[in-house]
């Protein structure tokens, strides 16, 4: 009793299409006449191909399961189907599929590309300042690209001319030729793999359906954009070949360093110089903010050099949000270098008072002891 197609491939009747393909590729590699000298290799290889040709199609597989092996073969014989003759799939195709499935490799198809080809994506580096990043801005950019031909409207054919299907390959773009055990597929020599013939190419774009041009485009930069943000503009890349879809334009944002602020996410940091009098007595001073103008910042009495004071919601805006970050001021107490006579007298008096207080409470000597203990 002859084996059924499932037995030939070594799988169960409930095997998935993926399991069928794996089994076929493994056996085809093993028994292909070009890879083995076994006497029964050609016969075995034909059986494997016949089995897979039936089972890989859901409709024919269902008919096979319903009729059974013998009845299905008889019906195929009467209908003239199932005759593979001396045809052998290209061993390179089998190896390509095998390594793609089992070795994790990528296979490059030998089939030519279609006439329509998608345009390439473009990248544009745009530098903005921090204020522009905070508020958001619309920028006009200029770049070289390919655009859809306005004479042939992307078809590649001279105005009024039609693009005809290649009669040599019937629009497939490839021709197949059998030589012994091998089937060779190559790009159609008549249409160069396009599948179509342009009898009268457009003079402006030379049959490509596009041409090079310097483009100007207005791009919207949203408020709160961060350094390194990439903004995609769909369809604004290079035009496709012969009516293919356009690629995309990616605008990469770089924010210039600021003279006052340093950015930390949505927070801003700045160095704030104050006099030692303000640090000691406290008070209010005006500080600039990123949105423009100034706000009052309260300096607590006794503020030390290096202290950090926070202005809430005075940092950067956030994309697609009403929430803002904070501004953190880092205090830098400035000591005057040039004193008037009166200022010196007052400071000398302050010095004496300070020494007496330290001596009376002993804190000065206690601090000194702690440094040496």
Curated annotation (Swiss-Prot):
Matching entries from SMART domains are given as: DnaJ
- Report the domain of life of the source organism: Bacteria
Keyword annotations of the record: Chaperone, Cytoplasm, DNA replication, Metal-binding, Repeat, Stress response, Zinc, Zinc-finger
Which GO molecular function annotation, any one, does this entry have? Answer: zinc ion binding
Tell me the CDD domains matching this sequence.
DnaJ, DnaJ_C, DnaJ_zf
Provide the GO biological process annotations. chaperone cofactor-dependent protein refolding; DNA replication; protein refolding; response to heat
What subcellular locations does the record give? Answer: Cytoplasm
The record lists Zn(2+) 1 as bound by 149, 152, 202, 205
Q: Which residues form the J domain?
A: 4-68
Record bears the keyword Repeat: yes
Q: Which InterPro entries match?
A: DnaJ, DnaJ_C, DnaJ_domain, DnaJ_domain_CS, HSP40/DnaJ_pept-bd, HSP_DnaJ_Cys-rich_dom, HSP_DnaJ_Cys-rich_dom_sf, J_dom_sf
Named cofactor requirement(s): Zn(2+)
**Sequence intervals crossing the membrane:** none
Similarity section: Belongs to the DnaJ family.
Free-text function comment from the UniProt entry: Participates actively in the response to hyperosmotic and heat shock by preventing the aggregation of stress-denatured proteins and by disaggregating proteins, also in an autonomous, DnaK-independent fashion. Unfolded proteins bind initially to DnaJ; upon interaction with the DnaJ-bound protein, DnaK hydrolyzes its bound ATP, resulting in the formation of a stable complex. GrpE releases ADP from DnaK; ATP binding to DnaK triggers the release of the substrate protein, thus completing the reaction cycle.
Protein name according to UniProt: Chaperone protein DnaJ
Source organism (scientific name): Rickettsia peacockii (strain Rustic)
